[in-house]
């Protein structure tokens, strides 16, 4: 089947450009890794007649990598070929660069392309955020410390999130801190492109209604036949396992010792393949919420809110889907619908959660994807990240809202 694909996908058509680099960069091969709630990473091998590109001219520079379809048949004599738009373009920055070899004619290089958000993984911070919600904290970090502007990110959220009294960042990079906060409340993110501005955009979402649904590909098992120039999927697999049937939560509110903060939730709606109870104690909530409320009607960061998120994570692992495609436009966050007798597990639609794409001048584009079945009641949730541990003595300073105040003041609860 791959031999058939080579006829309609010409890898010499892929283009790579880096800001302030005028030399032509000819793509030799590439490998890309994408996943929901993770910065993508594309490693692109290329050749250039510039035999000694300086690393300082590439690292940190904006770059663009475009995937093109095979060229159309040449036009009749006297007519120019129409401009062909790329199938997909990835915008980002160069975070890695390597010179592999060289000759008298050209040199071979490799660069790593990632979104600007990946740069937040450098460094670590110790900070306190007060009276801000999780989206507000994320936005303040992006804007104030990393010069993101309104066109660089988008919050597509179905629910409102309460302000937290205090949140601490302790010895974490800004990316690790953001990932930990977002995972805690079930917010996931993906990357899109603004072709008008030529930038990558990170989009934050919290509901399955925010998936992209207009993706359909035929299922064509490998049989040695050509694909007639049409993208398809094959080698579809499904992996099933028993997961927790319900989640039981309990917490203690020190300011209201008599508060009822115990409950249980079952998001499987009686589906088979579940067993057992997962007991979660001391989740960060002070209000239980209403068990019968659905979607955004359920109080954010309440007990049942956290219980549903925890159970959704268990249910995400119940069925894992995978497959291979020749499509260059498939991306995480899309719901793939397959036609042509695909396995039953793919019938509801496959939510693409991860993607590994490879191609070279001598091999066709192949994208191996991971997915979960689409559900109206269960959404993809990023894995919880461990909180940093504070050990030993931590020196600090008692402060006051008044400038040069000689005294430290306490509130009604005895806190500075």
Regions found by a protein language model. Give the residues of each.
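Amphipathic alpha-helical and helix-coil boundary elements used as assembly
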Residues: 1-416
């Amino acid at each position: 089947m791959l031999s058939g694909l080579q006829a309609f996908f010409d890898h010499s058509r892929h283009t790579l450009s880096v800001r302030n680099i005028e030399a032509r960069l000819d793509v030799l091969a590439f490998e890309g890794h994408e996943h929901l709630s993770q910065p993508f990473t594309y490693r692109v091998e290329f050749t250039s007649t510039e035999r000694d590109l300086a690393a300082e001219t590439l690292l940190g520079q904006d770059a663009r990598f475009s995937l093109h379809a095979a060229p159309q048949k040449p036009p009749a004599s006297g007519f120019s070929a129409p401009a062909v738009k790329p199938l997909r373009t990835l915008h980002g920055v160069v975070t890695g660069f390597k010179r592999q070899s060289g000759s008298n004619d050209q040199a071979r290089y490799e660069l790593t392309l990632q979104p600007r958000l990946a740069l937040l993984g450098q460094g670590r911070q110790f900070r306190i955020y007060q009276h801000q919600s999780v989206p507000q904290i994320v936005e303040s970090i992006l804007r104030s410390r990393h010069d993101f502007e309104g066109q660089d990110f988008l919050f597509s959220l179905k629910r409102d999130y309460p302000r937290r009294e205090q949140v601490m960042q302790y010895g974490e990079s800004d990316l690790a801190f953001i990932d930990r906060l977002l995972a805690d409340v079930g917010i996931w993110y993906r990357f899109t492109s603004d072709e008008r501005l030529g930038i990558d955009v990170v989009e934050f979402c919290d509901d399955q209604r925010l998936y992209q649904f207009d993706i359909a590909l035929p299922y064509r098992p490998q049989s040695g036949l050509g694909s007639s120039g049409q993208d398809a999927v094959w080698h579809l697999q499904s992996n099933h396992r028993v997961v927790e049937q319900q989640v039981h939560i309990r917490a203690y509110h020190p300011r209201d010792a008599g508060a009822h903060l115990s409950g249980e939730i079952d998001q499987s709606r009686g589906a088979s393949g579940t067993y057992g109870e997962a007991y979660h104690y001391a989740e960060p909530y002070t209000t239980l919420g209403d068990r019968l409320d659905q979607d955004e009607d359920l109080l954010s960061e309440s007990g049942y809110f956290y219980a549903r998120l925890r159970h959704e994570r268990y249910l995400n692992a119940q069925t894992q889907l995978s497959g291979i495609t020749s499509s260059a436009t498939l991306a995480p966050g899309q719901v793939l619908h397959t036609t042509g007798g695909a396995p039953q597990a793919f019938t509801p639609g496959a939510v693409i959660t991860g993607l590994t794409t490879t191609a070279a001048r001598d091999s066709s584009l192949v994208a191996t994807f991971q997915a979960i079945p689409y559900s109206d009641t269960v959404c993809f949730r990023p894995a919880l990240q461990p909180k940093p541990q504070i050990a030993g003595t931590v020196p600090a300073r008692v402060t006051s809202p008044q400038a040069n105040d000689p005294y430290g003041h306490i509130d009604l609860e005895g806190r500075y």
